[in-house]
Amino acid sequence: MKILNLENENRKFTKSIENFHVMEYLQDSSVSPMTAMEEYYMSKMNVRRRQVVIELDKEHSAIIQSGAMQWMGGHVQATAGIKGIGDLFGKAIKGAMTKESAVKPEYVGDGYLVLEPTYKYIILVDVEKWGSSGMTIEDGIFLACDGRVKNKLTARKSISSAVLGGEGFFNLSLVGRGAVALESNVPEDELIEVELENDELKIDGNLAVCWSSNLDFTVERSTGTLVGSAVSGEGLVNVYRGTGRVLMSPVAPTDSLLTATNTTQANPTVKNNLPLEN
C-alpha cells in the first residue's frame, strides 16, 4: 500500500521512534465561520490536532487503548490478545485498577494503523532507554505501544501511597523494547526530567507523568511532624527514592485536560489571589 499525501503543507510528522510517528495538523482547516477565529488562535498557541501513525510489519505489532483506532490500511487484523477466561478476568482487574481499558486490542499484519486525533500532546518514549525494570506511568495516559512491550501492574510500595495520596493501589508499568505513545496534558518541552542516584524527589501533587519502575514511591508528610506540615502550609507529598528517572509536569496536574488548560485550576494558588467581586 502507498499513501500519497499523508504529509502535506498542513500535516507534518513531528517525531518518530522506530515505527511510531506523531502527525500534527498545523492548523484546523475544517472550520465554520463561527469557529474560524477560535481555531486560528488555538493553532497559534500550539493547541492542535495530533495523531499517532503506526507502521506494521512481521516484526512490529501494536497494542492500543480500546477505541483508539481511526483507520487501518493493508493486511492488518485486530486481535483481542486474550488467552482464555482467566486472562480476561486478569485484564479486567488490571483495567479497573489503573483506569485503563480492560482489554487492549493488538493489531498485527502488514500496513498502517492510524489512531483517533486528539488535542492532547503525544509523547513518544523508547521503553528500552528506561532500563531493565522499565517505566511506570500515571493512570489514564497510555495510548499505544509496540507489541514487544509488556504491560504489567506495579503495586505501590506501601498502603500509605494509595490511601493518603488518594490514588489507586496499582499503576501500569511498561517494560521491554519498542516505542510507547502517551497522552500528556502539556507539551513535552515543558516536562522536567529528573535523574536520581541514591537520592529522593518530593512532589506536591500528581505531577509525575512517568518514573522508573525500580524507584520506591510513597506518600509522606512534607515535614517530619504534623505541626511542621501545618506551619509550612504543605500537607502530603509524593516521594520517589532510589536510582532512576522521573518525568514531571511543573505547570499543570496530569489528571485532566480541563484542569491542565484552565489557569485558575492548574495553579491552585491563583484562586486565593483573585480579587473579590463587589
Report the location of each language-model feature:
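Composition-driven recognition of glycine/serine/threonine/acidic- and proline-rich low-complexity segments
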Residues: 1-278
